[in-house]
Amino acid sequence: MAHLTCVKADEAKLAEVLGQLQGFGVKNILALRGDIPADMQGEEIGSFAHASELMRFVKQQGDFCVGGAAYPEGHPESGSLEQDIENTKYKVDAGVDFLVTQMFFDNTILYNYMFRLLRAGINVPVVPGIMPVTNAKQIIRICQLSGTKLPPQFRAMVEKFADKPEALKQAGIAYATGQIIDLIANGFDNVHIYTMNKPEIFAGIMNNLGEIVDK
């Protein structure tokens, strides 16, 4: 699945990239706005100010299956979760085919979010995003930037193994595995694992799941 961001992008360049992707047989696109630098304003942002605008453009360029981001705890720039869900509706109206969520460490947050989406009339498939923790400082920093809550049991795990990288990696894999098992048990058929370019993390989780995902 190709990832596209639209900060500083122009329509001509994106059309060229999408044409190349079509030529390679790529069908699935994850369309994201991307982070806007603090010193960037106005026309510097490019042709697209919002992810929904990028999604609509991609749909116009070819027969792509387009995914977008969803935020179970709200986007950091949104004033409230309700406002963020309204922004998610714009993505659906723009033709998004599925949503991939920001990381979360408490599945209850996702289940409550799903209820809110359905109540708002949003019923496109939602793929939960799971991030196994492998670095204590990194995960705390990411959570601070994204507004992701750290449940007590997760925080205790990170603090306990913060100075033991291999132990933290094993604990992170175990915690993520537990999240995924619970998601599968509650009807989710797909998850997106944020491995941070560490394929051994994915391998460890799949080894733990074993027969649970064996078709």
PLM regions and their residue ranges:
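Active-site-adjacent beta->alpha loops and helix N-cap segments on the catalytic face
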Residues: 9-18, 35-58, 78-82, 103-119, ...
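Short, acidic/polar
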Residues: 11-19, 79-90, 172-182
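Active-site pocket-lining/capping segments in soluble small-molecule metabolic enzymes
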Residues: 45-71, 119-173, 178, 209-215
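Conserved, mostly hydrophobic/aromatic
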Residues: 21, 91, 95, 128, ...
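Short, well-ordered coil/turn segments that N-cap beta-strands
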Residues: 25-27, 62-66, 96-97, 122-126, ...
